[in-house]
Amino acid sequence: METVKVTRKDLLLSPENKEIDSLDDVSALLSQRLSNVFEFSIASEEVQSDEVFEDTYPNDDQATFNLFSDVNTVVTKVTEPSIKNSRPLNYYILEDSPERQRQLQASVFTYDQLMKAKEEKWPACQKLHKVVSIKKEESKHRRRPSKKRRIRMKLLREKEEQLKRQAMAAKRNRFRKNVRKLPNKKKH
């Protein structure tokens, strides 16, 4: 392609930029310029505009444009059989059959049976050591002394132990002194 230098002066003075009075002239000029650039084929005016639209866009669901849908969304219409979520009537209402009546009769506990069971001894209930009695004094728990009090008590115990040790040491020393004062007995 050749590069052509175009100035503003050339554009303003060019014979193509005449004032166009009618719309037909404008559309003809526009179509001429577009056909030079894009190489469009001009459709004949004989075909009605409704017919052109119907030919290019048939009534298909696939051709519809969803404005707010995702680009990658694929819609598949899969119909699944509906599930019946209700229970059968025999779940709520029982039929009275002879077998069911026999089962009920076997599980019934009569008054006479209850009175007989009352007279029977229950060995597990006879053991007195299973009974727990709680006295009021036992329920009170001794509170733990505070930290300061525990430290004081520990110091007092240490002091008492030290005094005992000193007393024992003094007693031993007195005993040793007494032993030294005793006359020695000679063995013959």
Swiss-Prot record:
Modification Phosphoserine occurs at: 14
Principal location: nucleus
Basic residues bias locations: 171-188
Keyword Phosphoprotein: yes
Disulfide links within the chain: none
UniProt-annotated stretches for the region Disordered: 165-188
Cell location: Nucleus, Nucleolus
GO cellular component: nucleolus; nucleus
Keywords, alphabetical: Nucleus, Phosphoprotein
Protein name: Uncharacterized nucleolar protein C630.06c
Classification of source organism: Eukaryota, Fungi, Dikarya, Ascomycota, Taphrinomycotina
